[in-house]
């Protein structure tokens, strides 16, 4: 049985990716600015993760026990307590695209926090990514650069 990496905090996730933690509850990672290749691993996360994939990936990314359906210019959503990633086979990946991380504590006590379970794109059942137009992709990038 493969070991699953436990990443409970934003700092732990950022340390794994080799990037600086600027806030304990939220992080934006621009893949092209990652300082070094990162080893593949299956990860159990304690935060919400939203990936903007700009390139088509040929490796299988699993979310739970299923493969994620994604091409280029897609958003992928991972909920706290879920497992995702690639098999830890000794290979590495280099950054591309963007990643937004936010801890559930950021939303605790807010109207949005009380309704996060209503957003089904964060569930295992929703293993199909949200495909974006170039204009939608640019809007997302503009927002991420402001966080």
PLM segments and residue spans:
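Short acidic-glycine-tyrosine-enriched beta hairpin
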Residues: 65-79
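Short aromatic/basic micro-patch
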Residues: 44, 77, 101
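A hydrophobic/aromatic-rich effector-binding and dimerization subdomain
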Residues: 10, 20, 87-147
